Amino acid sequence: GLLASKALEYPDRLAVADQPNRLDLTDDKPCRLSFAELDEGSTQVACQLLDRGIRAGDRIIVQLPNIVELVVCYMAVSKIGAIISPVPVQYGSHELQHISATISPVAIVTLERFGALELSKTAESITNGSIQLLVFGTDLNLVSTQDSQKCLQLQNHQESFPIDADQTLTICWTSGTTGTPKGVPRSHNMWISTARCCAEAGNYQQGDRFLNIFPLVNMASIGGFLYPAILLGCSIVLHHPLDPGLYLAQLQDEQITFTLAPPVLLNQLAKSQDMWNRFDFSQLRSIGSGSAPLAPWMIETFRQQYGLEVINFYGSNEGISLFCTPMHTADSEVRATMFPRLGCGIAGFDSYANRAILSKVVDTETGETITESGHVGELLFAGATVFDGYLGTDNDELFSDDGYFHTGDLVELCGDPPAFYRIAGRCKDIINRGGMKISPAEIDILLEGLTGSSEVAVCAYQDDAQGEKVCACLVVEPDADKPTLDDVADYLLKQGLAKFKLPERIECFDGLPRNPLGKVQRFILEDAVRQRDQEGKL
């Protein structure tokens, strides 16, 4: 496999490293593995999984923070042909129970704790006679003695169940407008194609050193770092949770050449030139960002003051893979808000991504393809990076008749000729809180029984630090006391909702805006909340 070949080619090169303060977060010392050690460690864990009765095709939930063991899990599960379903550590029992019911896992792999999160206790909520709880440090470990008999067992298993690069490797999770996380199956080949697009966008070089601060459970980290690192023999340094001071220290001390960071952090660093200048970032070549719109002034500051280019990424677990780099434009305004129309046969964009993917924009009413600048429509995507459909759903309206994925995102064609997409909004209602995607419909459903309210729905409101936060919009029952923010939080926490999804504001209305079918018109709620902000009626 890819890892074995890199272990032979670069046995002593660093493959993956923990952050230096891991002991405070997990009670374990930081770990650093070379490519040879990663190959060996993942083989040991693969043998331990086989010992537990896990076989090819079995599904395993993995709830781990950004630590070395998570990278080992990806490699180990791949070696036995099983399917890994990574989930954020913020997920609570509510989300885990839904995921478990959807994929019928044979095991959940986790830690005792991560900071204040008691991960093993949360995982116990879904374990039963058919689901094993496997805790690193107790049930699984990287330091077991090599057992020739177990190695032979693994070899025999691999011969009996050879890996097909088109078979599912991961089931990641994305929040949808239906109100619950949806499973996104992705194969080895889908990840490899995404990795090649990301490597091209970031101009990755053999032997690069990456600093990863996004949770290693979705597109940004798996496609942006994990697979490119295995393809090119690059090193991954891990970071979690976000600590700006530690992040800067790691950039310097680990001699990082490329990193991804959320726009909120880059904005903060662009405003903190004294802090930035305390460190030596001479090895850093460029920085990627995404998950929310970028600020042109931030891109310009990094270029003019720090000598670094910022690359704008736009992707999703489903396989959207767009990016805007210095090769596409030097204009900060354009790079912050637009993406080249890859996969449209446009001259000047000759690249792997332009050949591997297809994209187009269609009118949301007629479905006709839009080709002229200034027109807005839904972005459709196809090609080697794109998944085949959500797990456990019919996917009838998810793909066009000619096989394109309906992204649910609105884009405008820009330029003369129209060579760029500008993200114009969302067909979907997803709330993006600091890069964590939250389904408002999921919270609506849980809040239906809230005492004191006759109607309730949540919507996004703008926040300088997180981008968006959750606002609970209530219609208070006659003669009832208005529910407080604590009432809402307690009610949701008792149902197992993850804390990052909790509303952080309440607004009361005489009635909720609805369409003729009775569906809440969330965009009207958002406008009303925004208007109250402008009028100072908080």
Language-model region placement:
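Conserved ATP/PPi-binding loop(s) of AMP-dependent carboxylate-activating enzymes
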Residues: 349-358, 366-402, 438
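Conserved ATP-dependent adenylate/AMP-binding module captured primarily in the ANL superfamily
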Residues: 91-125, 194-211, 243-257
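AMP-binding/adenylate-forming catalytic core of the ANL superfamily
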Residues: 91-94, 98, 108-110, 259, ...
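Conserved pre-ATP/AMP-binding loop-to-beta segment of ANL
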Residues: 11-14, 150-173, 180, 187-189, ...
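Conserved AMP-binding/adenylate-forming core of the ANL superfamily
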Residues: 12-67, 71-75, 92-97, 149, ...
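Structural core segment of the AMP-binding/adenylate-forming
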Residues: 51-52, 79-149, 478
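Conserved AMP-binding/adenylation subdomain of ANL enzymes
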Residues: 192-209, 216-258, 268-274
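Gly/Ser/Thr-rich phosphate-binding loop
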Residues: 256-261, 274-340, 358
